[in-house]
Amino acid sequence: MKIPRTMSTQHPDNVHTPFFTENIELTGEDEVKEAYYVYSHLGCTEQMWDCEGKEVDNYVVKKLLSRYGDYFKEHHLGRDLFLTLRVPNPEIERTEAKILLETLGSIPRSYDVAHHFYNDTYAPIFEIILPMTTSFASIDNIYQYYCDFVIGQQYKRLGGRDLTIAEWIGPFHPDKIRVIPLFEDKDGMLAADTILRRYFQDKDLDYQRVFLARSDPAVNYGQIGAVLLNKIALWRLHLLSEDTGIPVYPIIGAGSAPFRGNLRPDTVRRVTDEYAGAYTFTIQSAFKYDTNLEEAVSAIRYLEEREITPAREIDDTYAISLIERYAAGYQKQIRSLAPLINRVAAYIPSRRKRKLHVGLFGYSRNMGGVSLPRAITVTAALYSIGIPPEVLGLSALTENDREFVLENYRYVTEDLSDACRYLNPDSSFLPDEIKKILPDWIEIDPHSEHRVLSGQIEKAVTACQIDSVQDMIIRAGAIRKFLG
């Protein structure tokens, strides 16, 4: 079975609009074009399809095969290329819960479309991603519901007669689906191996994919906290795979901003080295639309063809205690910036028409009731005012912590240097303790034009001179090659 190495996603972190649409905000129809584009032009082998919000298109398989038939005859959906659905978590997103059932119910319909097109038995959709996974039951419920109700309904008889549903409208395939848990908070990531071990017990699995978030943990626990959580999870999943004999293929949800993963065409080698043990990396919108096309294609080819290195051992006991200390300092600083972040967030342009999935952050008790927008908007707001969020929390680290970070987070200085290209040292909102400690980590060399723009944005927002704020935010994002 081919496992994709790159997963294109619909994260709206891009500044520029893709060439195949005139819409500033991508619509559902645009996202069908986008799926074809990332397969055919960029070389991604997987597209994540977000099944939440009013603009969602449940007929994406039919549209792809009917509109781009020649391409998909040569590149088989479900064998060579993959479409993976991200569904609502009914435990968290109650108003979206029924969409989960609709989405699961659409999988056999998509199978029928592909079967008619290819005349074989490859399912075009056979994996789904469950966000905000926190327990074994949350992923097992989906697996069992699909087997018992979506597939099981075909054996029911109608009105007490001999006619089964399968005899009436045809058989239902595929017989089973694979559920990819997406772990987004500290407790989930630290329990990922335990949750999967339990999930493995009553199933005959030849492999398991698992998705580790990178953006939401950064917003919740800071840059270093997020990286260390990913590394602990990668190491524990490696041990789980060795112990059970079931290959585990981790996915890292990396964006272009250093705070959200620092995955760009020019950083693919160091990011894959940083996250040793990761099999698949997400290709988000800034990577696709804010970079040089040839460089993006070359970088994706590298990601698809590279040799996978095993996860590295990490002292998780010390790492967890460090994360708690660091996160406390980070959260204190971001709480103080929350009013400004929310003010700037109002001017961050939207890049997708649909309602995006909800996040864990914003009603988290450890943030003292402070409400913040989603990770991309938080990142965009802070960069726009010249305070890269990567610097927050550094002052909470001891000297031993710093040595541990330098040893286990290989490219921390490079990530901080990349981020601080967009630092405005003159910002009146930059915490004094950060100004004091930053020179111990890196040499600060801010981008002159971005520094001026961030100062103008800060001044305009604080003075409520809002006419040109969004334009300046877009100009600053264009310099960075990512919005947030």
From Swiss-Prot:
Keywords: Carbon dioxide fixation, Lyase, Magnesium
The enzyme's E.C. designation: 4.1.1.31
Catalytic activity: oxaloacetate + phosphate = phosphoenolpyruvate + hydrogencarbonate
Obligatory cofactor(s): Mg(2+)
Entry's Gene Ontology BP terms: carbon fixation; oxaloacetate metabolic process; tricarboxylic acid cycle
Broadest EC class assigned to this enzyme: lyase
General function of this protein: Catalyzes the irreversible beta-carboxylation of phosphoenolpyruvate (PEP) to form oxaloacetate (OAA), a four-carbon dicarboxylic acid source for the tricarboxylic acid cycle.
Subunit: Homotetramer.
Name of the featured protein: Phosphoenolpyruvate carboxylase
Organism: Methanospirillum hungatei JF-1 (strain ATCC 27890 / DSM 864 / NBRC 100397 / JF-1)
